[in-house]
UniProtKB/Swiss-Prot annotation:
Propeptide residues per the UniProt entry: 19-57
Location, primary (coarse class): secreted
Keyword list, A-Z: Amidation, Antibiotic, Antimicrobial, Immunity, Innate immunity, Membrane, Secreted, Signal, Target cell membrane, Target membrane
Name of the protein: Arminin 3b
Function: Antimicrobial peptide with a broad-spectrum antimicrobial activity. Keeps its antibacterial activity under a wide range of salt concentrations that mimic physiological conditions of human blood, which is surprising, since Hydra is an obligate freshwater animal with nearly no salt tolerance. Does not affect red blood cells.
Subcellular location: Secreted; Target cell membrane
Signal sequence interval, chain numbering: 1-18
Family stated for the protein in its record: Belongs to the arminin family.
Tissue: Expressed in entodermal epithelium along the body column.
Keyword Secreted: yes
Modified residues (Serine amide): 80
Amino acid sequence: MKIVFAILFLTFIALTYARSFEDLKEEIKNEIEKEIFDDLEEESDELDNNVKKFNDAKPWRRWFRWKNIAPLIPVVIAASGKK
C-alpha cells in the first residue's frame, strides 16, 4: 500500500512540476519576445534619428559639393568649346 501511495505522490509531483514547467517556459518565452520587441523599437528609434541627421545634413552636403564643382564649370565649358 505504501508503494501505491508513493507512486501516486510522485505522479502528483510530476504533474505539478510539468504544469509549472510549462508555465515557466511560457513566461520565459513572453519575456524573450518582450525583450526582442523592445530592442526592435530602440533600433527603429535609432534609425529614425539617423534619418533625421541625414536629412539635416543634406543641404550642407549639397552646398559643399556645389562649392567644389562651381569653379570647374568654366573650365569644362572652355574645354568643350575648343573641340
